[in-house]
Design a protein with these regions (language model features):
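Sec-dependent signal peptide recognition
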Residues: 2-7
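Contiguous interface-forming segments/domains that mediate binding rather than catalysis
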Residues: 19-196
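N-terminal signal peptide c-region/cleavage motif recognized by signal peptidases
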Residues: 14-15
């Protein structure tokens, strides 16, 4: 019995040690407020979505507990800066969706990687869409595995509410029904997709 307890204690310590010491595993997660993470930070303008300091453990994103967050001894800004180095582009499938006139309406990005949603925070994410959509884009993140990118100018993104809401409702890991603007100034929520 003592060995089992010792092994359990060691495994719990190992998870905490990884979270605290392996900064390469740190990520800023974009999560729904209804998950009630112990530690979260606001996204400008967002009501239903927050930033959560997290880390990868056994292939899954985990939230920092309040105790583990405090134990890191880092500020939110320092954590974000370090996590941004980890927010590299993932291997994802993406496609440009065009209208009948062959004009790109949006980009659909999906992957089985549970960090797909975090790619919008990668330093080069905005640059990838600059030539197609301009320097400011709108983004929908309905679940951890799916991102939709829309042009900010002359965008009809609200026409896609049924698509976004279906991806949000049907997921085991929903993220947000909100729409975000990403620009050189950062990320902020600008509205909410709604069911028709």
């Amino acid at each position: 019995m003592g060995r089992i307890f010792a092994l359990l204690l060691m495994s719990l310590f190992a998870v905490h040690a990884v979270a605290q010491q392996d900064q390469k595993a740190w990520h800023v997660l974009i999560e729904p407020t209804f998950m009630h993470p112990e530690v979260s930070f606001p996204i400008s303008g967002a009501r239903r979505t927050v930033f959560v300091p997290g880390y990868m453990s056994d292939g899954d994103p985990q939230y920092f507990s309040k105790k583990d967050w405090d134990a890191t001894g880092v500020t939110w800004d320092a954590f974000r800066a370090r996590a941004a180095q980890n927010a590299i582009e993932k291997k994802v499938s993406g496609q440009l969706i065009r209208d009948q006139n062959k004009v790109v309406q949006y980009a659909a990005i999906s992957s089985e990687d549970p960090l797909t949603a975090t790619m919008v925070l990668a330093p080069d994410f905005l640059k990838k869409f600059k030539d197609i959509f301009g320097t400011t884009i709108f983004v929908a993140i309905p679940n951890r595995f799916t991102v939709y990118v829309f042009p900010a100018l002359a965008s009809e993104y609200k026409d896609y509410s049924p698509l976004i809401m279906r991806a949000y409702r049907d997921s085991t890991y929903p993220v947000s029904p909100e729409v975000f603007e990403i620009s050189p100034g950062g990320i902020r929520a600008i509205g909410v997709f709604e069911d028709d």
